[in-house]
Amino acid sequence: MRNVVKPLKGKTMNQFVPKLFDVMKGYSKKQFVNDVIAGIIVAIIALPLSIALALASGVGPEQGIYTAIFAGFVISFLGGSRVQIAGPTAAFATIVAGIVAQNGMDGLIVATIMAGIILIIMGFLKFGNLIRFIPYTITTGFTFGIAVTILVGQIKDFLGLDTSAYTGPTIETLDKLNAVFKCINTFNWQALVVGGVSLAILIIWPRFKKLEKIPASLIAVIVSVIMVKLGMQAKTIGDLYTISSKLPGISIPHVNITMVKNLLPDAFTIAVLAGIESLLSCVVSDGMIGSRHKPNMELVAQGAGNLVSALFGGIPATGAIARTAANVKNGGRTPIAGMVHSVTLLLILVVLMPYAAWIPMPAIAAILFMVAYNMSGWREMISLCKTSPKSDILVLLTTAVLTIVFDLVVAIEVGVVLTALLFLKRMADVTEVKSWKYIGDNIDENNDPDRINLKHVPKDTLVYEINGPMFFAAADKFLDIQTVSGSKAVIVRMRGVPSMDVTALRSLRNIHAVCKRHGAVMILSHVNEQPMSVMEHAGFADEIGRDNFCANIDAALEHAKNIVEG
């Protein structure tokens, strides 16, 4: 009696169990203390970043905190990573700003809810492992483009420009640059000094190893506030926004079918970005702690986190690599640290949020300059441009330029389509059709340098060998298979064909029809599993005759010999 291996249902179901429930087994008091300390430190790091990223996204500063609190807690609680810290990230800044400018907060809530639903569906459909199929050139290109967009968007605040009199559009990157040039006469040197000092602190502070546990962004904010209080003239958050320290209520958007249709591309882009960035953060953190995350559960958690964030007035969220790394470095090893980070931010919101009104806008701009620099990957961009094939460079630069000039939705759509077309061309270039020449029985094999590669081909027999995938982009190459009048057998060797589509099958059918008109028999040699399945499903295997399928080239040549001599 044979042993039957049954599928591991328990293992399949376990991938949808939050990591929190796994790590609670054997959880110690010592680890709890480490998680609490790490969570508090990460919250201090996240505070200025959340405010800055919210402002860069065109929403109020408290909405960045809401996102880190609600989305951060849910994603840590349900997530597939032990140490993931989630919240607002720079990747969403440009797309969120565009949605808010065109559709208001209702549009942002609807887009974020749809993105959350898409992420949950992706998780349950086990798309966690498919995210890696997004080409590296696309992710590098749009990340660089986002960095440039963020940097350009902060120039006006860094220079203290007054753009209140400017009436032109300021949504696209080029529009923002135009606004800077039009309003350059309102330049405020004191704001530049505040921003310059903040930027210097952000660059220099991390070099002091003994002080690295104190976030440079927090020091920059404190110093800039002191400078303004001492008389430096620079606009603060309080000058531009009304800040609330109250907990938000549930936001129910005014929605209609037209809005849903218009925002669907944005929602899909948010979902893809959240999936890519969160899973990339998981991979990085896995390497730091020697663990393995659950990608599908992480996508479900990201979706749930974005749903909750939207309902409580937040913006899109995902795993933040820098904050996750800080969590690990400070001793965080379980999702408890991420949950403590969110609770700490909640306490800060209630107690200290009114003081955020004191933060100068040039300091926020300096923080975002550093965020843009760190995420830009400019060294990697240069390296890829120097070492990559021209087709990859084309995708890289196209995605980056489209992100800067237009928006992320257009960039990703064009980047994916362009990559697909270039991939098809590469596969088509790989596919080749070679013909064998007739080798008679009188060849001197001992003195022929090519004797190893030669086989005896019967008279009136044509032999062709196909290497590479048989698909629509390579279909024209099959026209090289020709039937000469007088031929009695045509062998097509398919050992090197891993796959076939219906377009290629149609070409093969046409070749078979030509063979029949010339009175020749078509023989297929060494047909692999997938092409054979396509032929059987389409009825071509019976059409050509099962006897005309041979296991290898020797059997095919012998079969052809019998046909010719018969």
Which positions does each model-derived feature cover?
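Short, contiguous clusters of charged residues that form electrostatic/catalytic patches at enzyme active sites
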Residues: 38, 199, 203, 476, ...
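The feature marks cytosolic C-terminal regulatory regions of anion transporters and related permeases
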Residues: 374-543, 561-566
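Transmembrane helical cores of multi-pass ion-transport proteins
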Residues: 2-443
